Every structure is written in C-alpha cells, then in structure tokens.
Amino acid sequence: MIQMEVLGGSVSWPFAIPPGRSNPDGVPPRVAELSAKTTSWRLSAWRDAASNAIGIAINEQAISIDVGHIKALSVCFMRRAKGPGFVSFEARMLETRGTVVLFAADHFNEDALRWLEGNTDKLAALFGMPIAIEDCGLDY
C-alpha cells in the first residue's frame, strides 16, 4: 500500500532535491503520475509499505530511500552570517553514519524553515518515524 501527502509550498523559497540525488526509478508509478500533475513548487511525499521505502518528489525530481537504512530524519538549518545558510530535510543513515539531503533550500529563509517545521508532524506520521529539529548555528 502506498500512502501519499502533497504539501503546499511557495515559489519564493523553492526547495529542491540536490543535484545528482534524484533517482526516479524508485518512485512508484502512481506517485510519479500524481506528482507530475502538481505544480512545481508543491512537495509530494510518500511511503510504500510493499518496498519499505519513503520518498520525496518536487519539480519533476524524486528521491527514495529504504526505511531500513535510515537511523533518523531531521530538519536542519543554518542561519545566515557570512555565508548564505540553508534549510534542509535530511536522513541520517545507519551503515555509513552519513546523511542524505532529501531536499533543501540553498540559503536560509525564515518562512521556509517555518513551513518545514509546520509540516514535520505530517511527514513524521507519513514516514512512521520522528523528525528532529537541528539548529546548526550561524554560517561563518
């Protein structure tokens, strides 16, 4: 069974899947069809119980990850200082101890952070795991 949630967004702070991370092969056909019909700034999230995968689609790109490989999910942000900062949604992986950025805004934006924080309950319920909020400080 596939569960899906389409979340509103804003063209003023577009989130994107990082370059080179999109893997449309892992997207269930029905999700790909529905995501293609949404406006480019809306974010589609899904969980596929059959493949035990979660995923994100936005602006004709998608990324999916097997839930069994995920240690934790988090909203990360770094406020502007000398650098631009960022707002991201990340998965911390079990095997590599690394993180995979599922989607991000490449510069800090308070509205983008508020939107993502406001949708963490929906994403946590859909993905079946808690989502931490991580303040990474200032971008020096």
What are these regions (language model features)?
Residues 1-140:
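Intrinsic disorder/low-complexity detector
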